[in-house]
């Protein structure tokens, strides 16, 4: 359960596919324009509830509650063995070895 004042992430549909501008490319027109916003929760709620938040710039927005205390996650994907081999080859060429003399 999320409490009033918690830092949260919400999701909101800004424009449905039918509301998109005519000059938008066809593949873009097929999907809604979505927005994810972080802010302080204005009332107690459960994940999935429609809630209102106040952003750091004091805007009040409404949307579906997705996460409490959201954080950034990032990685470079799964290990690729070929890149390790290439790294060894580059090191050999750059810093010496029989083939580099």
UniProtKB/Swiss-Prot annotation:
> Has UniProt tagged this entry with the keyword 4Fe-4S?
no
Activity regulation statement: Completely inhibited by p-chloromercuribenzoate (p-ClHgBzO) and acetyl-CoA, and partially inhibited by N-ethylmaleimide.
* A single GO molecular function term of this UniProt record: transferase activity
Which Enzyme Commission number(s) are listed?
Answer: 2.3.1.263
GO biological process terms held by the UniProt record: ornithine metabolic process
InterPro entries annotated for this entry? OrtA
Q: Which UniProt keywords apply?
A: Transferase
Q: Top-level EC class, please?
A: transferase
Keyword Transferase tagged: yes
One Pfam match, by short name? OrtA
Catalytic activity of the protein: D-alanine + acetyl-CoA = (2R)-2-amino-4-oxopentanoate + CoA
What does this protein do, in the record's words?
A: Involved in the ornithine fermentation pathway. Catalyzes the thiolytic cleavage of 2-amino-4-ketopentanoate (AKP) with coenzyme A (CoA) to form acetyl-CoA and alanine. It is strictly specific for AKP.
Q: Which family does it belong to?
A: Belongs to the OrtA family.
Sorted alphabetically, which NCBIfam families does this protein's record hold? Answer: ornith_OrtA
Task: Describe, as the record does, how this protein assembles with itself and its partners.
Answer: Heterodimer with OrtB.
Record-given protein name: 2-amino-4-ketopentanoate thiolase alpha subunit
What species is given as this protein's source? Acetoanaerobium sticklandii (strain ATCC 12662 / DSM 519 / JCM 1433 / CCUG 9281 / NCIMB 10654 / HF) (Clostridium sticklandii)
